[in-house]
């Protein structure tokens, strides 16, 4: 792995979210050349969710937003969001294996998806509608969940597609 920090590599340019939030930013540009060079030498870039504005001020960025912005910029086929939840759950708290934009909006309207899961799902929908074929939310607390997602037909967690 290779650690990517904003000060060292400056791969994420941000704009401030708002004055009320202080040093919280939204990505406006991802410099993919640095990431592509790291990937070419078979290393995995581990990116801190920090970016710099036009004045080189450091801003914090939501990690899911950074991951989505990088996936879109790299034109990734799939994005995995590793979380502390199984994925999207139905009313009976059972895992929903796959949802699309329409189903996600229905689940939000029905308040099945609520709270902090709403911005996570909205980010996933944005990523899926901007060139990434699918975003999966998987439970990082489960042993081998990433391998299960990558190497099985069934997958792990909830797959979100356009």
Describe each PLM feature range.
Residues 141-148:
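Low-complexity, intrinsically disordered Gly/Pro/Thr-rich segments
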Residues 97-99, 148-162:
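Conserved, well-ordered active-site substructure
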Residues 1-141, 154:
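Nucleotide/pyrophosphate-binding catalytic subdomain
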């Amino acid at each position: 792995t290779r650690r990517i920090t904003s000060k060292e590599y400056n791969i994420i340019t941000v704009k401030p979210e708002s004055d009320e939030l202080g040093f919280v930013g939204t990505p406006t540009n991802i410099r993919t050349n640095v990431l592509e060079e790291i990937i070419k030498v078979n290393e995995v870039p581990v990116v801190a969710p920090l970016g710099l504005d036009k004045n080189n001020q450091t801003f914090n960025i939501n990690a899911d937003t950074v991951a989505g912005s990088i996936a879109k910029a790299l034109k990734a086929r799939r994005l995995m969001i590793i979380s502390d939840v199984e994925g999207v759950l139905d009313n009976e708290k059972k895992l929903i294996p796959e949802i699309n934009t329409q189903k996600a909006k229905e689940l939000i309207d029905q308040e099945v998806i609520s709270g902090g899961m709403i911005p996570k799902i909205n980010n996933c929908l944005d990523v899926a509608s901007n060139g990434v074929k699918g975003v999966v939310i998987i439970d990082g607390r489960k042993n081998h969940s990433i391998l299960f997602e990558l190497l099985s037909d069934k997958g792990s967690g909830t797959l979100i597609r356009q």
